[in-house]
Amino acid sequence: MVHLTGEEKAAVTGLWSKVNVDEVGGEALGRLLVVYPWTQRFFDSFGDLSTPDAVMNNPKVKAHGKKVLNSFSEGLKNLDNLKGTFVKLSELHCDKLHVDPENFKLLGNVLVCVLAHHFGKEFTPQVQAAYQKVVAGVANALAHKYH
């Protein structure tokens, strides 16, 4: 559960309504893989991830980034029940994929950076604070199965 004020919820949903999930998703996942290269081990089937350009232009990275942000969008619709929303993804990432749950935090922080880059002055410190709460809540929900 993420505790947001009415103003914070409005800021998050208002900005999110302007997000191009295809573009931002691919960029966020791509940046995660470039900035934290050890995360690439979970994406062996994605082909060439040998250089930053290869990662950022990889169609499988872009497609999976879109999928990730579509799931994030579902979380935004269910802020009062994030653990329930992400229970199956938590089980998948824990039991089958064995993803270190710290990676969820890293991706959340990268997403915040990408949003700041895309929205500039519109991404005020107040908007950032609200998004930091949301990505922390999503990361916690995704890590729930690990506890």
From Swiss-Prot:
Tissue spec. comment: Red blood cells.
A GO BP annotation: hydrogen peroxide catabolic process
SUPFAM superfamilies membership: Globin-like (SSF46458)
InterPro entries per the UniProt record, alphabetical: Globin, Globin-like_sf, Globin/Proto, Hemoglobin_b, Hemoglobin_oxygen_transport
Binding site for heme b: H64, H93
Entry keyword Membrane: no
UniProt keyword terms in alphabetical order: Heme, Iron, Metal-binding, Oxygen transport, Transport
One Pfam family recorded for the sequence: Globin
Residue span(s) of domain Globin: 3-147
MF term (GO), any: hemoglobin alpha binding
GO cellular component: blood microparticle; haptoglobin-hemoglobin complex; hemoglobin complex
The protein's assembly and partners: Heterotetramer of two delta chains and two alpha chains.
Sequence similarity: Belongs to the globin family.
Name under which the protein is recorded: Hemoglobin subunit delta
Species for this entry: Ailuropoda melanoleuca
Source species taxonomy: Eukaryota, Metazoa, Chordata, Craniata, Vertebrata
